[in-house]
Structures are given as structure tokens and as C-alpha cells.
Amino acid sequence: MATRRSRCGGKMEVLEQRQRAGHASRDATGTDRIRTTASLLPPPRLDYRAISENITSKSLNALNRKSRLPHDAVASVARNYIEWKRILSELNSKRNERSVAGETIKRNASGPERDAAIALASLLKVHVKELEATLDIAEQKCLLAALSLPNDTHPNAPLGPESAAVTLSTHGPQPLPADSKRDHVAIADHFDLLDLRSGSSVAGTSWYFLRNEAALLELALTNYAMSIAIDHGFTPVTTPDVVKSDIAVRCGFQPRDDATPPVSHMYHILKTNTSSPELILAGTAEIPLAGTFSNKVYSSINMPLKVVGLGHAFRAEAGARSADTRGLYRVHQFTKIELFAVTTEDTSESMMEDILSVQKYILEGLDIPLRVLDMPTEELGASAYRKYDIEAWMPGRGSWGEVSSLSNCTDYQSRRLHIRYRPQGADAVETPLARLPFAHTLNGTAAAIPRLIVALLENGAIFDDNGSVVGLRLPRVLKPFWIGGKKRNIVCWDDGSD
């Protein structure tokens, strides 16, 4: 879907050009690498005009998504944008008058006309300075209000809460009946696969140690998912677990909510230097992956750009112990393989379907019951234009559980991270950087390891005639990635081997 670009123009565009002037270079891949004098990114470049011209639809969109907005946020953008344009018009007028006064001074070496022009120029200089300061304030008011707004929503996204999700497809074998004997914690305890007690002693509730075959299963799942992503054209990347909180916010993640007092959803690293940027543990590899593309301009001929990141996800909100947080289902840290793509604005929807096909290929190979859901408006968060979830049946829990997610964020992240592209064509070559279109970004889970382990243990447990668990049947696709672990002989591959 093509997204209309901002036509704010004027000082905002001049500011962006000034930040970049003389600081762009092109690498061997044809990427314009933009160097700024400060380590921080330029302010987000949001489309105030589009917001101002669509107050009703933008307000309804926020309402449908249950976004918690400041009072009158959408209308505030429109009011401040109108004021910004008025001030800019007056500022340009005063600048023109000052220019005329300057020409008069140049033409007259002396005399009353020159003296009057000098006096007028001095007065206009003060007016221009005052108007520039007022314009900056109006810009900041526009930005502050606009940053609170969520992305637009795909017209086919279901309206409502999580229960309104639409099942798009089902895959894999028929779901087994719900059975408490298949609880993954009980199975893991029996085979010494999971050490929650030590995790609690060492780090606290919702931390864990994987042991024996469970540790090997994590390695096998990781390499299996990475290998398929690479086969589908994704470039492998290992990501840092630490990111600047500014990058997370620009991606649509809020390190702290607006409760009183604020509740942190991410782990914050204590500053040792007050001048250092705030650092957090990444909630997903999506954040550092998106950051690698920030403040760059790509040639559309080299797009889409596709990477698969191996990282750890840290979640501070694992929550109180309950059936929903039992064992490995909701934890504070887990290994996660993340698919990330940067596309042109007219190809992101087709890329979403391409990524979904990769996710289904990975998960269908595990031979577990799956369903793909089109998620409703209240589940989209701030950044997603459309979101698919893939859930696996977990008979021990007696319910479906999310094992993968996929979001098309359109230009929500790229406008905040300054990810642009240069379209092909004769006129595009001469297009100034500030007028180039923003790219679209997409992210999807290739493998969230603990949830997959839950699904594999609960669906693959083997019981004897007395109802005692005696082994684990694992999918054959993992066998090439399995290392060691043959001493106990509890794993049976679904190709009949052990």
C-alpha cells in the first residue's frame, strides 16, 4: 500500500537537509550512509499533513486499537500543524523583507535610505529570530502529539479484542485431546530437562535452566530455523542483546508505561556515566535489526533487504505464576530467531505473505497442530499495520499458544528511524534526500524456542500402557541438527529411528 509522504516542507525539510549536508557517502552496495555529528538520530519525520486532513479516521483508528492517547491528541496535531504553517509563512515573509533591506543597503553607500534600511534590517533580524523560536515550539508540539498515534490499520484487520481473531488456515496433524499428563513441566521434571528451582535461586521467578535433551533441542531448533531462513534468502545476523532505549521507542516499544508510578516492561541497565545513553536489554532481535538500517538510504534495485537475526529476548513482564505462565510458556529470557525485511512502499504486503510462507514451512516441519490467525485491532500494538499470529496446540496446557508472530509496520518504524530508499528512474536520481520515500519494515518470528519446546514435549511425549511417560518423539527435520545426547536413549525420531 502506497503511503502518502509528508509535505511539511519548509524549515522541517531544511533542517533535515542541513543535518545531512556533506555527511553522506555511498558504500560498495550502493547504500547512502548518512553520518551525523551527534550520535543520536534526527527527530522522527511524521506526516502531519495526512493526520490533519484525516482527523476523524485517525481518531477512530486509535479508538479501534484501544490506544491510550493524550487528550485530544489527533486534533492537537492538526491545530499545531496549522499554526506551524502560519508561522512559517510569516517567517518566510520576514526573511524576504530582510533580503530586500539587504539589497537596499548594498545599493546605497550612504544617505537616509541606507540608514532606514539598516534600521529595518536590524528590526527584522529580531523578528526572524523570534519567529524561528516560535516555529521550533510549534514543531515540537506537532511531533509530541503525533508520536502518540498508532500506525494505520489494514482494512481487512478484524475489529475488537483478541477473541475476534480470524482463523486463516490450519496445518499439521489433528490436535490431541487435552490431557494434564502431557503437561510439559511434569514431562521435563521426569526426564530432568528443566530446572526451574535453580533458575529461581540464581535469578528469580520465571528464569530457568534447560538441561540434557532440552538444551540440545534448543540448539537443534535454532539451527533448523536459521537454515531454512537462509535457504529463503535471508542474511544471517547475530545481534547484540543491549540496545539504546531510543531505538526501542522508535521501533514502537515503550520501555516504561504511563502508569503511576511507571512500570517497566524492559530491563534497564544502570548508567555508570550520566552522559551515556540509556541502555536496555532487547525485548526482541527486531529492535537491533531495525537499528542497523537506521539513517540510511537504499537503492530500490537492491530491495527487498532480508535478514534473520539470532538473539535473546528479555521480557520484564513475565507476570505472576499461573497456568498461562507455568514452566516455559512465559519467561523473562528466551532465544528467538527473528525475520526482518525492508521493502519499498508498494511491496510490503506481498512480502508479508512471503514471510508467512517461510514461517509456515519452518513450523509445519515440526509436525505439530497449527493455526494462522489474522489478529484484531486491539492486538496490533503501536507499530503494526497488520499482524498474523501462528498458534500451536499444547495438549498439556489444554489450549492453543502463540509460537510465532508477523507484523507489517509499513512506514511507522522507518519514519522514526529514517530508513529511506531511492526509486529507480531518471527523475529519482536528482531527488533530494529529504524528499525520498520512506521504506516499509516487516518482522516475524522464525522460532521462539521455549514455546516450541513446550509444544514438542506436550505433543511428542510417549507413554507406556500404564500411562507413564517413557520417551519423546521428535520431528525428523531436527535430526540433522542434533548433537550427542544418545546415552539416555529417550528420544525417538518420527522416522522410526532412535
Stretches with model-predicted labels:
Residues 44, 70, 86, 171-498:
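TRNA-recognition modules of translation machinery and tRNA-sensing kinases, especially anticodon-binding
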